[in-house]
Regions:
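N-terminal secretory signal peptides that target proteins for export/translocation
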Residues: 1-10
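C-terminal segment of classical bacterial N-terminal signal peptides
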Residues: 18-31
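Signal peptide-proximal N-terminal region
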Residues: 34, 58-80
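Extracytoplasmic "Venus flytrap"
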Residues: 37-61, 83-90, 113-116
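Extracytoplasmic/secreted envelope proteins and their assembly/folding machinery
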Residues: 39, 57-64, 93-97, 110, ...
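Short beta-strand elements in bilobed, periplasmic/extracellular small-molecule ligand-binding domains
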Residues: 73-86, 147-151
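Short, well-structured alpha-helical segments in soluble
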Residues: 81-82, 86-107
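Extracytoplasmic ligand/sensor domains, especially the bilobed periplasmic-binding protein
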Residues: 90, 104-157
Length: 157
């Protein structure tokens, strides 16, 4: 009887291991990969807007770090890349182009935090189907979704 139990336990263990190995190949690879969501940070820590920009962009990055420390958003970790615009329209366009994609993930929203940058990138963003987030600044016709469907005005003009 001892030999039967030992043989039974060995067979059960082998079948369990084989079953586990087979199930690992049946599960999509994305289950094992860490999911991420990429955010561009077009900052203005230097230049005429630096007094407000240093605190705003520092807080934005601190918040994303905080979210990641607590497991992300439903397990999705936040990634970002920062580019300094100096509150300059030409540099905002350069940053937009540089930040548009990272590791194969295209941005879904871009925040210029200023009218000069918003005017400079609005046409390109419409072509790229990227949302321009505006918070009470930018083009007044951006408040009308029929004119600029890719502009989201948080505070209407």
């Amino acid at each position: 009887m001892l030999k039967i139990n030992k043989a039974f336990h060995i067979k059960t263990t082998v079948f369990a291991i084989v079953g586990l190995l087979c199930s690992m190949f049946a599960v999509p690879q994305s289950v094992f990969a860490e999911e991420t969501q990429y955010f561009p940070v077009a900052s203005s820590r230097v230049g005429p807007y630096s007094a407000m920009g240093t605190g705003y962009y520092g807080a934005q990055i601190d918040y994303m770090n905080y979210v990641n420390m607590n497991g992300g958003v439903n397990g999705v970790m936040l990634t970002w890349q920062e580019c300094e615009t100096e509150y300059n329209a030409v540099k905002t366009v350069e940053c937009y182009q540089r930040l548009l994609e990272k590791d194969g993930q295209k941005i879904v929203v871009f925040d210029t935090l200023g009218t000069p940058g918003a005017y400079a990138v609005i046409n390109r963003m419409a072509e790229d189907n990227v949302v321009l987030a505006q918070y009470g600044y930018g083009r007044t016709d951006g408040a009308d979704g029929r004119v600029w469907p890719w502009v989201f005005n948080a505070a209407s003009h």
